């Protein structure tokens, strides 16, 4: 990671999101809704990622869709289910925040951005005590991603594909000031930002990092969308 001050970039945005999967698109929509100037960078020519490989089921506690389905659920129930399922090893504050925002996030995706979700009322996911899961009609994550990409486009958020982020910059204070990306023709471009959101998966596709941080899983097979996530290592 190299040093570069924010004032030296020819092009800069307020919020820069790396990754145009469900996480990145949702983050971009939220930041845009808060009044920020947002840009999304996607490594692939066509966004897909793990979202498109998944069944697209999203857990939530206390959504309006659950209430319409007659399901008595709440954020506290989801929080406790997640805590027990993780055998108490999860970060309690993160679980609390995620569960607490889950219901309103589902409502927001459906009502503000047209994501076609419904509550799966006849299925209780293993480890859950009530039907927390929401999904699209096809039960495929690709359908959710298509609707999120449409919402990003409808809001006029810039989404640049075939843009592989290869390095991060920080200023003298240590704050991230921008990124370096590489285009398919090999040309490098630098882009400044006030806030950087890395929504480009974890490091499951990077055997070196798995061996370092989760040595007991060093020999495990990874079946997700391949990313090495050097961005995490750079940070």
Cite the ranges covered by each PLM segment.
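Glycine-rich, N-terminal phosphate-binding loop of Rossmann-like dinucleotide-binding domains
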Residues: 20, 62, 183, 200-201
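Conserved N-terminal/central alpha/beta ligand/cofactor-binding core
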Residues: 2-7, 36-37, 43-158, 164, ...
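Helical element adjacent to the flavin cofactor pocket in flavoenzyme catalytic cores
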Residues: 136-194, 233-235
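Aromatic pocket-lining residues of Rossmann-like dinucleotide-binding sites
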Residues: 31
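Beta1/beta-strand and adjacent pyrophosphate-binding region of the FAD-binding site
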Residues: 7-23, 39
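Generic hydrophobic/aromatic pocket-lining and core-packing "Φ" positions
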Residues: 27-28, 106, 233
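Short glycine/serine/threonine-rich phosphate/pyrophosphate-binding segments
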Residues: 24-27, 206-207
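Glycine-rich loop(s) and the adjacent beta-strand/alpha-helix scaffold that form part
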Residues: 184-187, 191-235
């Amino acid at each position: 990671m190299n040093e570069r001050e924010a004032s030296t970039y020819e092009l800069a945005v307020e919020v820069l999101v790396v990754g145009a999967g469900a996480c990145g698109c949702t983050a971009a929509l939220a930041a845009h809704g808060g009044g920020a100037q947002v840009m999304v960078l996607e490594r692939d020519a066509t966004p897909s990622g793990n979202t498109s490989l998944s069944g697209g089921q999203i857990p939530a506690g206390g959504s309006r869709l659950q209430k319409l389905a007659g399901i008595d659920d709440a954020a506290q129930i989801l929080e406790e289910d997640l805590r027990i399922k993780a055998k108490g090893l999860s970060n309690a504050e993160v679980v609390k925040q995620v569960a607490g925002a889950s219901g309103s996030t589902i409502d927001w995706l459906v009502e503000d951005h047209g994501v076609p979700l419904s509550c799966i009322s006849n299925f209780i996911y293993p480890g859950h005590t009530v039907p927390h899961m929401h999904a699209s009609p096809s039960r495929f994550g690709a359908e959710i991603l298509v609707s999120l990409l449409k919402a990003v486009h409808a809001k006029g958020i810039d989404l640049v594909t075939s843009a592989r982020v290869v390095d991060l910059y920080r200023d003298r204070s240590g704050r991230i000031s921008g990124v370096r990306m590489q285009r398919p023709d090999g040309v490098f471009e630098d882009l400044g930002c006030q806030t950087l959101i890395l929504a480009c998966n974890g490091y499951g596709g990077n055997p070196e990092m798995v061996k370092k941080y989760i040595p007991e899983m060093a020999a495990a097979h990874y079946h997700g969308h391949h990313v090495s996530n050097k961005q995490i290592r750079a940070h």
